């Protein structure tokens, strides 16, 4: 019993809660749905019940606001009676498209009990009775905020196209809209799903500014549920199609808020975009900004523009509702079920102007698309500056073709994210399209500026962005196919070219071929082993070194003269065609620098003229590939400094005799290899700004120099001390002109040059002792010229093998490469009679070069040996001197001590005394023994003693 007392009141409490929940969920009145589907031939239209989420969240007993003109209450009992009944016979054709809306979208707004109750109510219905869901979209300025739809007003409309088999429906208009025209929805009861989902190919524009996205799959046709969508209020889209302005834009699959089923008719003065297509094409991956291609429809279009109605510069206005009405097809056509829908784009700026006429030759059908542009918009304006969509209702009528064919009209579906994108849709008057294969051109603009779509077959694009060209098949092949336009996107800086670029792309290979391989003897003069391209007209002048065709000239070119052309750079690979060239003239061109590989391949070159160009910089070891070079003319350029290694080469430039550097703003010479050129005899540095330090280095280090040309001011300074200089160094002669002798020239170096004890005079004295070559110094003399040589560094297998075989014989890598190349040339190319003379010269020069190099090596070796012997001799001499010095020092020390003689004498005396003592002792012992013997004899014979 205790359990019964505990559970007894529970059903009552539960029933009270459920009753409150039902009262809260039950709407006050059954409001007519914003989209009223009316079947004209089948009977009067019956209202659909709107979900309670469309109503404001307020008390059921709250007083209703007073009726305004155009409101439901204002319309009287006839209007209210239509809102009181539930729908009894929903349209069968729309049921399949509406039954998945409940599962496709989730209602993010409203209380949870009301959502659950209302969802259960809809789930209990049959699939034919299910109601479309309207999900409010989150406001742009408020994240996850509740958005209430405006109050709706109902306007009585006339029946449109009450033909058999068609159905016209009405869409309610918000009360705050300035235009009371309702949205109309005309539905064909047959093949709606098939025609909309499969046959209408909609090229899409997905505006995704400020973000690049690339889909992983191709964009497919929208699901059937979305094609059957009756009302496109902000909340009516499923979550995957909703776009939050605060979130970064996603990939193109996440379609933006608004979808415009509009014919792409646009003419933008800033951007023109042509799309001609008549076949099923795969959609290109989406990029930064996606533009709809120009559709080449098989119908004639007429789009008279209606007068504007209101200003589009406001920042907060009612939604822009596009009203689309579709005419019924002919008797022999398949039924086209074209929906009329209302679109509410967010923060999309649109300008639409009309096109009078488009003519095609494939089919003859007409489409009328009256567009109602915004009021007070400037004629030249391409974008409308609005934050909220304008309160306009452009009405577009798109009747299908009256031909019984499988071709379908091309519609442009513009899907734009609410990110302040400016869309301009204009058209070109009178566009003629032929059924022959066309060129599809698509133009892309940077993000955020106005987007233009222009259906123009031939395009002149003034924008800097370029066009992408493809070929479309013949329209006859499309009659059995569904026309599907490619979704074209592209970063604005990646696409290139317009129609002119097509010509350039076709002619560029020809020009490149002509510039790299051509019959040069038709343009220039060929003969006597000379190629001369001098005196050409400005249009014929060369811009790079030409490469002759193999059979252009029967012989070799030993002299190349390209003087007075427009050559601005040198490619080392081009010289392989002139492997026997000995003289190269490139004066009066537009060279600005000399890279290291500028003359790679001119192995036998002897004469090089680079005068009167615009050379500013010479890379290190530029002349290393010219071992036999005798003459270099670098005059009349813009050289200000000779950097370290300019004349550095493994071969030491043994044959360079003449070097001209005049008429350059040269101030600094940092390359010591210039002063150490072993064979340099003529150096012209006139009209430069060299210093006295450079002159000292030349006089000190350039051993074989015979003639030196100096700037006039420096030469005249030296001429003031002509007698003193020639007296100090007899190997230096000054040739002074009359101007230097008669005119008094200020000489900044006078103090250092005129001082007999100065550095300059000491340098001349050192030159006199070490150099015997007579040096003549002049002022601003004209340059000499001489030269001859040729080239060709190869890299074939034979040369590589020779290099490997010479590794053990020649340790120097540069010399080894040079010798292997010479051997390869003598083996492979010298078999022909017309090059035998050049081969003989090559052998002589190679032998001379090797001789000079070997002499230098021997001289270095002798110097090293002499240095070693000298070091040994010096070491020995130093040691001997050190020993002698030590002995002298010891003897001096002995002499300096006073008791040394006394000690020696004492030692001598002691030794003598000892010897004398020993002798005395021995004598004494002898005497003692003699006396003993005498006494013994006397004792034995006494008679002897008595007698």
Swiss-Prot record:
Cellular component terms per the entry's GO annotation: membrane
Membrane topology note: Single-pass type I membrane protein
Keywords: Coiled coil, Glycoprotein, Leucine-rich repeat, Membrane, Repeat, Signal, Transmembrane, Transmembrane helix
Residue positions with a glycan: 358, 789
Main location per the UniProt record: membrane
Signal peptide: 1-27
Location(s) in or outside the cell: Membrane
UniProt keyword Glycoprotein, yes or no: yes
Region span, Disordered: 42-88, 226-257, 294-458, 484-514
Extracellular side: 28-905
Protein name: Leucine-rich repeat-containing protein 37B
Gene: LRRC37B
